[in-house]
């Protein structure tokens, strides 16, 4: 090699870490340090896999692991579709339309986020149980007898997924609404000038532009769902979180629990990779500073009623009704709140 070739090769080798990690500025080093601290528990889980002999995992694979995987994936699908539909629809309505109560619903749609999923699960289980007010009223009105009618089982995969949807859709709502507010009305007007109807403009223009934000909201909802233990435990749904707990504390096999946790991490990474792959190299940026805010469309008549119902229903089901049920249960019990609960 010529001396010039040696110099070029040395420069290439020295630039490799910069291309991989970027310029090692104090801020970047600090970010890498924080990332390592946050990732330490995950690295600990992976490191704990080394002591596993595989017997416990083989037993789980032959008995409950297929059910665990099916339930976890079913919950992920229900939550992704449910939070996506509710979050996008409500965000679009309160951003693009004005109707009676729309200003109040803008912040009221965030209230279900304050309700833990297992608490709302307690409330709905009492509401929809055989001895609950709903089934009791139906039997009194229609004269039904025990075993003579069908009623959906709230303590199931579908019921647990519904609970997650009702309390986690605000993640998608928040991020989708922020994305819709950032969009310039010029883009939507251009699509209308090209002959697109409002629905077509929403599907072909506004929704793709908001896709990164929506994907982020759905990802947050999925992370909450996959990490939840209380709700699925109460509903009797076997998922990775319940299996990890029982393997660790019930069977006393920490290494097998780490293997299950690593499988759960693999599911999460697979979901993120699928979303990133489907997006490809697409990126979304404002290419012009000619921004005009969206002028909301005033709704009246049946359209206003439909918009109110669409936006108020998640608030009622995700916050108002569970709070009412909890107050009702407290009133029936007649117990006073113990002052010891507030003792420091």
Label each region the model flagged.
Residues 2-22:
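Short, Lys/Arg-rich, polar N-terminal cytosolic tail immediately upstream
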Residues 20-53, 63-181, 209-229, 257-277, ...:
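Membrane-water interface segments at the C-terminal ends of transmembrane alpha-helices
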Residues 55, 59, 106, 140-143, ...:
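Short amphipathic alpha-helical coupling elements at transmembrane boundaries
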Residues 100, 196-197:
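Short coil/turn motifs that cap or connect alpha-helices
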Residues 194-195, 208:
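Glycine/proline-centered hinge or cleavage motifs at structural transition points of membrane proteins
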Residues 226-251:
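Glycine-rich helix-loop "coupling/hinge" segments at transmembrane-helix boundaries
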Residues 235-239, 324, 328-343:
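Hydrophobic alpha-helical transmembrane segments and immediately flanking/interface helices
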Residues 278-310:
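Flexible interhelical linker loops that connect adjacent transmembrane helices
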